[in-house]
Structure formats: structure tokens, C-alpha cells
Swiss-Prot record:
GO terms for molecular function: chorismate synthase activity; FMN binding. Pathway: Metabolic intermediate biosynthesis; chorismate biosynthesis; chorismate from D-erythrose 4-phosphate and phosphoenolpyruvate: step 7/7. CDD domains: Chorismate_synthase. It catalyses: 5-O-(1-carboxyvinyl)-3-phosphoshikimate = chorismate + phosphate. The lineage of its organism: Bacteria, Pseudomonadati, Pseudomonadota, Betaproteobacteria, Burkholderiales. NADP(+) binds at residues 48, 54. One of its GO terms (cellular component) is cytosol. FMN binds at residues 125-127, 238-239, 278, 293-297, 319. One of its GO terms (biological process) is amino acid biosynthetic process. Its EC number is 4.2.3.5. This is Chorismate synthase. Its cofactor is FMNH2.
Amino acid sequence: MSGNTLGLLFSVTTFGESHGPAIGAVIDGCPPGMTLSAEDIQPDLDRRKPGTSRHVTQRKEEDLVEILSGVYEGKTTGTPICLLIRNTDQRSKDYSNIAETFRPGHADYTYWHKYGIRDPRGGGRSSARLTAPTVAAGAVAKKWLREKFGIEIHGFMSQLGDIHIPFMDWNEVPNNPFFAPNAEIVPELETYMDALRKDGDSVGARIEVVATGVPVGWGEPLFDRLDADIAHAMMGLNAVKGVEIGAGFHAVSQRGSEHGDELTPEGFVGNNAGGILGGISTGQDISVSLAIKPTSSIRTPRRSIDKAGDPAVVETFGRHDPCVGIRATPIAEALLALVLIDHALRHRAQCGDVSVETPAIPAKAS
């Protein structure tokens, strides 16, 4: 397989390239009978789309989604749902100077060796442009999870470069272009990004995403553990170089007496496990953290080679995000939703008749 599909029972296959006529996704396995329209999907696409502030790429794409199949009289039919997003603001000439060279840190070199051909326009299939159909499919998954289980999925940026963003208020996340949960730090982030763009450089970020309301019992040990599938999906997001579940790498310095979340009749005392034990959801919040590397396409001259193997200097003049992490929050939310809906359907298929009434403890201790 070519690695373009995520999920087993709720599977999503994306298609297209950054500068092609359109990009999109085909969802196979969406349960029938759910009301669905473009208006259910568009808000998440609007959160991700480019050109929304001076701190992201200035490529102007409306990212209007079209539902081509799988919906009849406003309801899903259980047949494949095709979602289409047309590209309208390509500038392929911006990439003519890198067609024969390889950008340091980019997929140019590896795509060339794997396929013997590559599309240099905007990175082709390796472009973050291809996260738009993922977000569209994720919006469908979010809706089903919310309506069937009351599950809510929200994300935020917790670090931009070396600036840590203390969590203050979920309500602040939609009020700034950084998805930062802290209004007080936004001016500092803006100043930082303005200087970075002036320097022609880029920077990384850390994104947190949380799912609340997930029932206990989702996940398939051993190799399809819920946390393993979450990590697999998140690593499929452009520029992600690390994934943590719960305490993550902090678990290295914790003792067992500290890390193991104690159970009481009133609930779990902590959530170092990130809502997952033995690959199966505990009923607590599922918490995931992503490390996103700096954008590879920058104006700063970098040493490289051309297709003949000769030395070259690469400068990229296209419209690029100086920090791809700024727009990554809705993408991370979508990926978590896609993994959760797939495991919800898998759990229903195998264990739908299983009912364990006791013990049942709250997700959090009071």
C-alpha cells in the first residue's frame, strides 16, 4: 500500500497535490443516518486555512469544501463520502529555482530517491496543503463522536520556539491566530514572529490536544493500542517529530509511586497515563502533545546539492508558514477524532454487547 489511508473501519484516503487543480478525501465506513452538510465541515477548515494573519503563509485559499457523494437528503448513506477542495491560488513559478535542487530538511531528496520523479511546486504531495482534506474528514468524525458520545476535542499551542505559553483559558484559544490559551502572551508571540519573518527564518512549536468524554474500553491490544494508533496518526502530520501521551517523556524521571494514577471510588487521582492504560481508554481525558519542527522552506541561503550531486545554494521564495505549528491545532484535533471514531466502531463491532456495570468510577477525583 502507498500509505495514503488512515483507519480500518472508518478509513480516510486523501488525494491531490499542493499545486494541482484540487485536493480531497474519501471517507469509507461513515455510519449512515447522520445529518451532514458542508456547513458542518467548513468551520474547521476556516480555522486551518492559509492567509488568515500575517504570521502564516499569504497564499489565499478559501478552502470551500464540496460533498460529492455519500450524502442524500442531508444524511449520510453509509457509502463513501468524497470531499473536494479546489486549489485557486497556486504560484508554481515561485518554485522554478528549486526544481533541480533539494531543500535542506524537506522531503525533496527522499521523494526523488523513492519515486525517481517529484513535483517541486509547493512540495507536491508532501505539502502541508494536504492537511486540509484531513481536517475536513476530521470534522465529520468530530460530529459523529459528539452526537453519539458527547466527546469534545480541543487543542491549543503551548510553546512557540523558546516561548512557553502558560495555560489560562480555553475561551482565549479562538481569539488569536496562534490558538494560544493566554491573551497576555499574544503580543510577545506577535513580536517574535515579526522578527522571525524579517530574518527569513522559521521556528517550531508544541501543540496540545485533549479529548473529553471518551468512554472506557476503546483500544485494541497489543499492536493496535489506542495510544499507538494516535501516535501513528500524529506522526503522519507534516513536520511532527515527536508525540507524547499523558506525562510522555516526563515519565522517565518519575517514580512508579508518582506515575501510576491511583484509583479511588471518587475517581482517578491523576492522569499521567493520558487517559490510556494497556492501550485501552480509561474514561479520562485523552491528552496528546506534539513537537513540530521549523518549516524547511526559508529565505535564508542554505547549502545543498543538485540532481547531479554538485554543490548548490538553496533559497526558497514561495509563500510559506514561518511556523507550521501555528495552523496545526485544528489538524491535530482532526487526527485525534479520526483515530477515536475508528476505534469506536471497532469496539462496537467486537464488544458492543459487553456491559460491565461495576466498578465504575468518575474520570476525575472530586
